[in-house]
């Protein structure tokens, strides 16, 4: 059975620290779904550091090189010589294109296992999984059983997703109409409010796929929006409320403030005026509590049914919070 190998070199989103003896960095070989994957950590050559008592130099891993190999039932086709002495790579390209998905899947899985180890075992900051659109995943170097490079591998360009291109979670484009505001901001910058900062953090977490953090940031943002509107910090009432809340003498739920308390204070009830968005805020806080107490991204609806939370639902909650922000500003 002919041996086929694909070599992927994947650059990391953040450098991972390594303190290793002078010899070459470690390699790990492991099976995955019928394939053999050799992982080599690629070390930076432009810097290293060594404290007085350190036995080895410290540097960073900036890439992971994975060689994925398998025994195939069929051999790669030879490159065809055309009558005009040109090389026809198409048969070999088609062969390698058909083989790519399983080799690619192994490279993604093993590389992300390495990154998970650094993120959660060694607590390396800013580590992100290798995305499926990474160009290197689609353009490996192929080798036959003799270690000879196969020239039929295609060069594929994969478009990187642009967060917010379709306007998700309030993303807007700079247009001629917005340009005067940019000019003004450059001359007179303004610090964003705490609520806006929290909303932005929730948005970033959502685009990163960190839904737990997005939910927590949204819930905190909602509390800040509501309590600062009802109990202005600069007012005696606000100072009194903060004191009593800090001393655990008073506990007022956001949902109560948005219904009966709002109707008493402002003759308007968010629950009555925006029932769908009010329900979204309710579910947001139920999920926040589930995360805080059990770490689970879910909540129970009014019928006691457990509901798993996905990106679409968090997007709905984000829109409800922005709707609530606008409603509060009108009071």
What are these regions (language model features)?
Residues 99, 106, 113, 243, ...:
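Charge-rich, solvent-exposed alpha-helical interaction surfaces
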Residues 85-155, 300-311, 315, 329-330:
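Basic/polar, acidic-poor N-terminal "presequence/leader" segments
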Residues 1-125:
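Long, contiguous, compositionally biased segments that the model treats as domain-scale units
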Residues 48-60, 76, 84-100, 268-331:
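Charge-enriched, short contiguous segments at helix-coil
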Residues 129-271:
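Helix-loop junctions and short alpha-helical segments
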